[in-house]
């Protein structure tokens, strides 16, 4: 059977099917030929035909083809990723959330801090061919009264959570190695996909540690982070670390973490103390260290776009853009692995990508590769995803226009394919 892509195109307001196949990999599926497409190779688009065979991408025509889709010279890219969002959890409207992620072409999501019980409640809806794929850290490691303890308090006050959802569930308060010894086994029993840790103004750790005025604005002793990283790596787990300022970025690198969550400057206010913009500037030596160690850095800069460039805070917007541009240019200089993550509960990485594009640090090809490949690789480092290569999972998006010429084309998705299955509108809704 041969069909044109126009006959398969899914409306951006449609609902997507998901949730009837067990496991993360599909059983035997149709052998589908995708002809007359322009396929992104990480740098440019090359015109060729691709095939999905049992959920795997190949560019060699199989002996038998069950269906042929004419891509009509449109542009094929890997799916997008979201390397930092806490919104895949039961307090959210999960069905609507999944629909929106798929609509936006985001197939892979990383949740770096969640309630283990919340993960259990959404498990049946995710990590299957017709849905999004998600990894979870479960509870994060911080100091008593440190971030994210204030989130637990807020949800208790709202009647959503109880005290049991705090220390030992959503987070683990750790003051020293003895306390880590007592709680580490409990944490591992939750079967995390990776480890989330927190550094907040770590150069001021001793002053903040026992002072209640810094509630929610403090994190781990940076010396203790070294031990956590060692234990995590011994258990086969990667470590992600929340940072606020450049001093935290430095401490995370010294500890040997695998991923830094947020670039310094993702927020420059809110703390008890006022901080100069210079405190958020990454040092040249730290950028070189991040590149040398292969550390992933998740951006989380899109919040700056909410500051009206022509409004009363125009100067703050200008300063934020200048800082973000400076740090991105430095990380780019040393080829640091940059992944996109929004940390925006009600949004995703589409605005994040558009904001970074507006800074004109990266050409469209590099930004697209960051969003598709690097982001996917830090979410699922052991899977063959994020690139349109022989033997990789047959997951991709088809765009109406060329995103290398106009990056806004990333919002013009005409077809979505995940593990060899064409995602279609749910006609029952």
Where are these regions (language model features)?
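Bacterial N-terminal signal peptides
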Residues: 4-15
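N-terminal metal-binding scaffold of metallo-dependent hydrolase/deaminase domains
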Residues: 17-66, 401-406, 421
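Divalent metal-coordination and catalytic microenvironments
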Residues: 37, 55, 73, 84, ...
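Divalent-metal coordination cores built from histidine and acidic residues
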Residues: 80, 95-212, 217-237, 285-306, ...
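Active-site environment of divalent metal-dependent phosphoester hydrolases
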Residues: 87-90, 115-120, 200-206, 244-250, ...
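Active-site core of metal-dependent hydrolases
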Residues: 209-322, 337-339, 377-379, 400
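His/Asp/Glu-enriched, well-ordered alpha-helical/loop segment
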Residues: 319-402
